[in-house]
Amino acid sequence: MGFIEPPRRIPWWLRIGLWAAKRATGRDLLIGRLLAWAPKAALSSGLMEALVEHGHGALDARLLQLVRMQVSYAAACPFCVDMNGAGHANQGITDDEIEVLRGIRPAEAVASLTPRERLAIGYARKLTDTPLRFAPADVDVLKPHFTEHEIVVLATTAAQVNYWTRLIQALGVPPAGFSDPA
């Protein structure tokens, strides 16, 4: 359980969202039930999650999963590491690459990471640092490798995971077992 209990009564329209989340994830997510205390926050969180891009053109699912995992590790969120790391082998993410995401190994030392993946990981890490410090040069380094659309998708993906990491940790939501062996 988290730091607080979910409400006993959840509006019917939020129960539909909880059902959809359970169908998509295979888990009855505590965070969704806790958000029922603030229905507008639950609705906006669900919309954000539903509308975020999970792969588009050259920003494939592997690259975006690397970004999600990087933010999860950088924010030290056990739930997020569990959820965003689940199925990493299906995307070809190796143990060496996970060491990069965990900050154990420099990205340049892992040949399997492409230059774009290295840049995206670095950008995600910078988006998770506190305090945030961005200069035009931080985005200028991305421009030769990513389109404007792709830069926005990278930024919104990292921001989305940052949102969830802070919310989940603030409410004490434990890992949900996404990475547990079947």
Show the residue positions of the predicted features:
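Iron-sulfur (Fe-S) cluster-binding segments and ferredoxin-like electron-carrier domains
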Residues: 39-43, 81-100
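Short alpha-helical scaffolding segments that buttress acidic/His motifs in well-ordered protein cores
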Residues: 66-71, 101-102, 120-128, 152-165
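Acidic/His metal-coordination segments adjacent to aromatic residues that form catalytic metal sites
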Residues: 102-115
